[in-house]
Amino acid sequence: LSFSIMKAEQTIRDKVTVPMPNSQRYNVSLFFQDYFPGYKKVKLNLKGVLAGGLPITAPRKGYEDGFFRMSPYKRIDLGLSYQIAGATEEIMQRGIMSKLKNIWIGVDVFNILNIKNVSSYYWVTDIYNQQYAVPNYLTGRQLNLRLIAEF
């Protein structure tokens, strides 16, 4: 478990104090991994992230003209791994396999809750020179298959 509280500010022309472009207010992260009881070849992992949004300004305008923050970043990933072969198994003693310690196969579900996090904004300007922020979203839920060979 990791918890951070952050504050990065700058003063512009000795009159306006604004957040730095990378100033997230908070970040909470969790990573948990464990074996299934009685099944040392099966591991489950869980990762969660909650982070405050970054400050954004419109193009051709500065922080003095105002800013807003992106929505908070939220994500939960879930993974399951199975050990195909370990160093003590007979198959791992022959040929090229003798160079390996373990072989794992796994499946992950990234962003299991399918949360639409904002990555940036596309700015649209109307005929009256008003600018509107249109969000660009990160990828939703993804399925990942993996094969890990430990040397």
Predicted regions and their residues:
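Gram-negative outer-membrane beta-barrel transporters
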Residues: 1-57
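A general secondary-structure boundary signal
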Residues: 6, 40-42, 46-49, 77, ...
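Membrane-embedded beta-strands of outer-membrane beta-barrel proteins
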Residues: 30-32, 78-80, 145-147
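Extracytoplasmic gating/loop element in the C-terminal half of outer-membrane beta-barrel translocons
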Residues: 38-77, 90
